[in-house]
């Protein structure tokens, strides 16, 4: 009997340990991102979508949901002020997309560069940003700008790749296909601690450029 109990308890602990992993190549907590009926304690979860949305998300778009956790912590990729960006951990800072003039150089005031040119234009209405207003596809490639978001590159349901990046196969519900594998790299272990530095930074081993080429040729 004791042996049976040990086995059962061991199995239970293993399941619990796996379930505690939100994105860590394990079981994501569904209700962290999704809501079945857009209702919680008698209140709307997503007030902007009273009838819900196609993905049963807790916010309008996948990127909105991602940023509810990752904007100010767990990577801090979207600051509140483009003039005071967050400490860099890698991707972002997407707040530069909201800047009215990116040109800080000589004559910048008369040669303005809109924030639309800051980088990856993710669709996140809650942060005041949307699809690229100029480009219809990724520079050098053919990824549709209209569908770009956090989950275009990162798998929200978890995988074993660096930063949950997609490998070879379909992305965005099959609307685009990656032909290069995810890169091999070691990232900063504590993304809520100190930011990038000469001694604390991501180490890229192989495949990063090829992976970027999935979208950029």
Language-model-detected regions and their locations in the chain:
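Hydrophobic helical h-region of N-terminal Sec-dependent signal peptides
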Residues: 6-14
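Positively charged n-region of N-terminal signal peptides that target proteins for export
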Residues: 1-4
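N-terminal signal peptide c-region/cleavage motif recognized by signal peptidases
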Residues: 16-18
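A motif-centric signal for short, conserved binding hotspots located
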Residues: 20-217
């Amino acid at each position: 009997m004791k042996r049976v109990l040990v086995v059962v308890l061991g199995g239970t602990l293993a399941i619990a340990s796996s379930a505690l992993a939100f994105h860590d190549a394990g079981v994501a907590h569904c209700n962290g991102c999704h809501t079945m009926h857009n209702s919680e304690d008698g209140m709307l979860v997503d007030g902007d979508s009273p009838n819900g949305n196609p993905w049963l998300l807790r916010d309008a778009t996948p990127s909105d949901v991602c940023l509810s956790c990752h904007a100010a912590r767990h990577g801090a990729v979207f600051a509140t002020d483009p003039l005071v960006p967050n400490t860099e951990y890698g991707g972002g800072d997407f707040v530069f997309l909201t800047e009215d003039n990116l040109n800080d150089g000589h004559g910048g005031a008369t040669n303005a560069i809109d924030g639309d040119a800051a980088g990856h234009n993710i669709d996140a209405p809650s942060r005041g940003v949307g699809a690229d207003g100029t480009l219809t596809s990724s520079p050098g490639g053919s990824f549709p700008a209209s569908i770009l978001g956090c989950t275009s590159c990162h798998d929200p349901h978890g995988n074993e790749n660096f930063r949950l990046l997609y490998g070879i196969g379909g992305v965005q519900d099959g609307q685009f296909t990656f032909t290069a594998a995810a890169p091999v790299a070691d990232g900063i272990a504590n993304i809520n601690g100190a930011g990038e530095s000469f001694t604390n930074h991501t180490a890229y081993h192989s495949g990063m450029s090829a992976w970027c080429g999935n979208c950029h040729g």
